[in-house]
Amino acid sequence: MVPPPQPSLFQLTFLTGDKPILTLDDEFISSHTKVLLISDASDKIWEVKLDGNRLAGGWEEFAAVNNFSEGNVLVFRHNGEEIFHVAVSSESDDDESDDTDDSESDDESNDTDDSESDDSEDNGEGDSSLVNKEADSSSDCFLRARVTPYSLTKDRLDLSKDFKFMLFDEHNKPCEIYLVNEKGRKWTLRLSRNISSGAFYITRGWANFCSANGLIRGDFCYFKLSESGERPVLLLCSHESGNGHEDKEEEEECPEADTLKICSVGGCSNEKNTPSRFLTQKFTPSRFKTGQLYISMLSSGGLRESGIKKTGEIILLDNDGRKWPSYLNKTGQPGGEWCYIRKGWREMCEANGVEVNDSFVLELICEAANPIFKLHSKIRNKGKGNIVTSKKRALHARTVERTPGVEIDGERGSKRGCTRVSNRSNTYLKGKQPESCSVSDQVANVRQSVLDTLNTIRHFKAELKTRERNLEASLLELDALGERILGISKILNNNLA
């Protein structure tokens, strides 16, 4: 797979009649004359021509089919090669309505806006939920911030009203602040303060910082504040996937601090937390088609701290002890590495009742020779964030005895494709005898496998047809160019004669 351009994920605001400009690197733009766009609204792959880095022929039709509305925040994600997945941010409407007055205090047009009112900061929260630095200099605190569509679109991070900077100019003039990632790379941003609310906000570089460090909409990131130099510094300690679980507090240990105090609005905890080993993923239609489950290397401290530095074999495991051999491929640029699981995960989801558009939680276990990703729980649709009920878990567990060819605790099933559940399986299955697999079940499994193979073949067939058309067009252009050169040569020869 071709490494993704930088950035591999970005957002644009849809305007009727406007042709969006893709924020891609020069290398990608110079080597491509078109892109292939996909969305959840249609199974069709749309070929859209590029005019430089601007979407041209075919974009209007794609926008019409997907019913994009004026002002929608569109999220572009590179899926490899020329394919980009386009979706409407689910929070774009809410954020635009909630933060309408924020634009009045946005300082990107001129410096005089710094003193205007910012209604979104009146609640003392902003985009962060956090932190007050203790007077004791030996006590360190985290800044817990959430990446929202508004913060990416406006290139601005609103901080909690309770958060203070000792080095900020007493006359409330904007100053510079450094954001430093875990590799030591530094970004210079602007720190300003709203006079009416007293809340701080960071701008002019926040979106670039998120893109370079793999931070996407819904993620939570944790910073440690340092004011030992001439300018305040926020050190990125970790970040975790959000996906609507704002109450999940599995903060990771910051490598920069010896004694940490993880703070929130409700108070502080002196306990250290180990790196998060849990990854929240969504089973999207595009991932079903490509068979690739993308995971950011920064989406979990456990993934980064586990020592996974290159591609290799992994094992997928569910709560019933069933195993699927798989492969983890790592790619991307330093500071924005990401990886994807290539095979086995769709079969694991199917066996555990995880359907398209469902979310699920994977737990990373590195006790064996190969890393293990364990399916920890399923999350219901529509963003409710509820874990699948025990009744449904029991119903899914019954399918264990009917799933052919799956390894359970190192043992294979019988010759007829049946499997046996170990003593460590769900207590619901204790004492149950293995049941025979019916012919209809086996036929259904084979049929599903054939359908999966057909979908994959159709996907690559569409890509091959597109490439074939491009090559044919190139041949025609070369023929026309040859005729022009021949004509010019004849004219020159006649003039010389």
Curated annotation (Swiss-Prot):
Tissues expressed in: Specifically expressed in the reproductive meristem.
Localisation per UniProt entry: Nucleus
PROSITE patterns: B3
Name of the protein in its database record: B3 domain-containing protein REM1
DNA-binding region, residue intervals: 7-92, 142-239, 278-379
One Gene Ontology cellular component: nucleus
Primary gene name: REM1
Pfam families reported for this sequence: B3
SUPFAM superfamilies: DNA-binding pseudobarrel domain
Function: May play a role in flower development.
Keywords annotated in UniProt: DNA-binding, Nucleus, Repeat, Transcription, Transcription regulation
GO terms classed as biological process: flower development
Residue stretches of biased makeup (Acidic residues): 91-125
SMART domains linked: B3
Alphabetized GO MF terms: DNA binding
